[in-house]
Amino acid sequence: METILIVDDDQNLCSVLKEELNEVGYDAEFVNNGDEAFGYLTNKPVDLVLLDLKMPGKDGFDVLRELEMKEIKTKVIVLTAYADVKSAIDSAKMGASDFISKPYDFDELLITIRKVLQKDNL
């Protein structure tokens, strides 16, 4: 079972998304900020991170930078309400595999998740 970590400060979104992902066969968990993300990732590697950009403390860009610095190899999909072109380009340059704007369509998100996770299997 593939594991997904949701990193977002919106507790309601995290709870709903975790439930939706678990229902379709993923092992999903969530944390509410960048600091918690590194505590989690240090102890339990995951296949994919769904990452918000705007959070208190360490934001999504900080998380992307730190993933690279600490050489934590995991796929990242940015999932954010701040869907401007510059953020998408900057995220890609920092290693994000894809970029989805909120509000998201779960079916489209699921297609993107499957696409990103399958890249290693090609």
Regions found by a protein language model. Name each.
Residues 55:
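Receiver (REC) domain active-site loop signature in two-component systems and cognate sites
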Residues 104-114:
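C-terminal output helix
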Residues 32-36, 59-62:
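Acidic catalytic/metal-coordinating carboxylates
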Residues 11-29:
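Two-component/phosphorelay signaling modules centered on CheY-like receiver
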Residues 44-50:
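Active-site beta3 strand of CheY-like receiver
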Residues 39, 61-73, 90:
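Short amphipathic alpha-helix used as the core "switch/output" element in two-component signaling
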